[in-house]
Protein backbone atom coordinates (compact mmCIF):
# COMPACT_ATOMS: atom_id res chain seq x y z
CA UNK A 1 0.00 0.00 0.00
CA UNK A 2 1.41 3.37 -1.01
CA UNK A 3 1.23 6.15 1.57
CA UNK A 4 1.25 9.78 0.52
CA UNK A 5 2.18 12.60 2.88
CA UNK A 6 1.28 16.22 2.25
CA UNK A 7 3.50 17.91 4.85
CA UNK A 8 5.72 19.49 2.21
CA UNK A 9 2.88 20.57 -0.06
CA UNK A 10 2.06 24.26 0.06
CA UNK A 11 -1.67 24.88 0.04
CA UNK A 12 -2.96 28.08 -1.45
CA UNK A 13 -5.12 30.26 0.78
CA UNK A 14 -8.38 29.42 -0.95
CA UNK A 15 -10.20 27.84 1.96
CA UNK A 16 -13.16 30.21 1.57
CA UNK A 17 -14.46 28.03 -1.23
CA UNK A 18 -15.03 25.25 1.35
CA UNK A 19 -17.14 27.40 3.71
CA UNK A 20 -20.57 26.96 2.03
CA UNK A 21 -20.09 23.18 1.84
CA UNK A 22 -18.96 22.96 5.46
CA UNK A 23 -21.79 25.22 6.65
CA UNK A 24 -24.44 23.11 4.89
CA UNK A 25 -22.86 19.89 6.17
CA UNK A 26 -22.81 21.12 9.78
CA UNK A 27 -26.42 22.37 9.59
CA UNK A 28 -27.48 18.99 8.19
CA UNK A 29 -25.68 17.15 11.02
CA UNK A 30 -27.41 19.36 13.61
CA UNK A 31 -30.79 18.70 11.98
CA UNK A 32 -30.18 14.96 12.02
CA UNK A 33 -28.95 14.89 15.62
CA UNK A 34 -32.11 16.68 16.73
CA UNK A 35 -34.40 14.53 14.58
CA UNK A 36 -32.80 11.20 15.41
CA UNK A 37 -32.75 12.06 19.11
CA UNK A 38 -36.54 12.37 19.04
CA UNK A 39 -36.72 8.95 17.34
CA UNK A 40 -34.01 7.25 19.40
CA UNK A 41 -36.39 4.76 21.01
CA UNK A 42 -36.87 3.19 17.56
CA UNK A 43 -33.38 3.86 16.16
CA UNK A 44 -31.43 2.77 19.25
CA UNK A 45 -32.55 -0.84 19.00
CA UNK A 46 -31.28 -1.18 15.42
CA UNK A 47 -27.67 -1.86 14.43
CA UNK A 48 -25.40 -1.39 11.45
CA UNK A 49 -26.84 -0.87 8.02
CA UNK A 50 -30.45 -1.31 9.15
CA UNK A 51 -29.99 1.63 11.55
CA UNK A 52 -28.58 3.85 8.80
CA UNK A 53 -31.29 2.80 6.33
CA UNK A 54 -34.06 3.48 8.84
CA UNK A 55 -32.57 6.87 9.73
CA UNK A 56 -32.30 7.78 6.04
CA UNK A 57 -35.92 6.77 5.47
CA UNK A 58 -36.96 9.18 8.23
CA UNK A 59 -35.46 12.23 6.53
CA UNK A 60 -35.24 11.47 2.80
CA UNK A 61 -38.21 10.90 0.50
CA UNK A 62 -37.99 8.61 -2.51
CA UNK A 63 -40.56 7.28 -4.96
CA UNK A 64 -41.15 4.32 -2.60
CA UNK A 65 -40.81 6.18 0.72
CA UNK A 66 -42.41 9.33 2.08
CA UNK A 67 -40.09 10.75 4.75
CA UNK A 68 -41.56 11.39 8.18
CA UNK A 69 -39.37 14.50 8.50
CA UNK A 70 -39.55 15.92 4.99
CA UNK A 71 -38.04 19.24 6.13
CA UNK A 72 -34.59 17.77 5.53
CA UNK A 73 -35.11 17.55 1.77
CA UNK A 74 -36.55 21.08 1.79
CA UNK A 75 -33.71 22.58 3.82
CA UNK A 76 -30.97 20.70 1.96
CA UNK A 77 -32.16 20.29 -1.63
CA UNK A 78 -29.89 18.40 -4.00
CA UNK A 79 -27.59 17.34 -1.16
CA UNK A 80 -25.49 14.57 -2.72
CA UNK A 81 -26.34 11.10 -1.40
CA UNK A 82 -22.80 10.43 -0.15
CA UNK A 83 -22.91 13.61 1.95
CA UNK A 84 -26.42 12.77 3.22
CA UNK A 85 -25.21 9.31 4.27
CA UNK A 86 -22.13 10.81 5.88
CA UNK A 87 -24.33 13.25 7.81
CA UNK A 88 -26.53 10.36 8.97
CA UNK A 89 -23.52 8.29 10.10
CA UNK A 90 -22.00 11.22 11.99
CA UNK A 91 -25.31 12.04 13.71
CA UNK A 92 -25.99 8.41 14.65
CA UNK A 93 -22.45 7.96 15.96
CA UNK A 94 -22.78 11.12 18.03
CA UNK A 95 -26.09 9.98 19.52
CA UNK A 96 -24.79 6.46 20.18
CA UNK A 97 -21.86 7.96 22.07
CA UNK A 98 -24.13 10.32 24.03
CA UNK A 99 -26.55 7.57 25.08
CA UNK A 100 -23.66 5.26 25.99
CA UNK A 101 -22.11 8.01 28.13
CA UNK A 102 -25.51 8.73 29.71
CA UNK A 103 -26.01 5.05 30.56
CA UNK A 104 -22.52 4.86 32.07
CA UNK A 105 -23.23 8.00 34.09
CA UNK A 106 -26.56 6.61 35.36
CA UNK A 107 -24.85 3.36 36.38
CA UNK A 108 -22.03 5.17 38.18
CA UNK A 109 -22.01 7.14 41.44
CA UNK A 110 -22.93 10.25 39.44
CA UNK A 111 -20.17 12.37 40.96
CA UNK A 112 -19.51 14.11 37.66
CA UNK A 113 -21.79 16.25 35.54
CA UNK A 114 -24.53 14.57 33.57
CA UNK A 115 -23.61 14.22 29.87
CA UNK A 116 -25.13 16.90 27.64
CA UNK A 117 -26.21 16.25 24.07
CA UNK A 118 -24.44 18.75 21.83
CA UNK A 119 -26.56 19.73 18.83
CA UNK A 120 -24.08 21.97 17.00
CA UNK A 121 -21.07 19.90 16.05
CA UNK A 122 -18.00 21.22 14.27
CA UNK A 123 -17.73 18.22 11.97
CA UNK A 124 -16.22 18.40 8.52
CA UNK A 125 -17.21 16.36 5.48
CA UNK A 126 -14.80 13.67 4.35
CA UNK A 127 -13.92 13.58 0.67
CA UNK A 128 -13.66 9.96 -0.48
CA UNK A 129 -12.05 8.92 -3.75
CA UNK A 130 -14.47 8.29 -6.65
CA UNK A 131 -17.36 9.72 -4.64
CA UNK A 132 -16.43 13.32 -3.93
CA UNK A 133 -13.30 13.87 -5.92
CA UNK A 134 -11.72 12.73 -9.15
CA UNK A 135 -7.98 12.52 -9.77
CA UNK A 136 -8.20 11.39 -13.38
CA UNK A 137 -9.36 14.76 -14.72
CA UNK A 138 -6.26 16.66 -13.74
CA UNK A 139 -2.51 16.27 -13.44
CA UNK A 140 -0.83 14.25 -10.69
CA UNK A 141 -0.64 17.24 -8.31
CA UNK A 142 -4.31 18.23 -8.50
CA UNK A 143 -7.66 17.01 -7.23
CA UNK A 144 -11.12 17.99 -8.42
CA UNK A 145 -13.55 18.29 -5.47
CA UNK A 146 -17.34 18.38 -5.55
CA UNK A 147 -18.35 21.42 -3.46
CA UNK A 148 -21.37 23.67 -2.99
CA UNK A 149 -20.62 26.75 -5.12
CA UNK A 150 -23.04 29.36 -6.49
CA UNK A 151 -26.08 27.55 -5.03
CA UNK A 152 -25.32 24.26 -6.74
CA UNK A 153 -23.23 21.15 -6.19
Labelled PLM ranges:
Residues 1-153:
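Nucleic-acid substrate recognition interfaces
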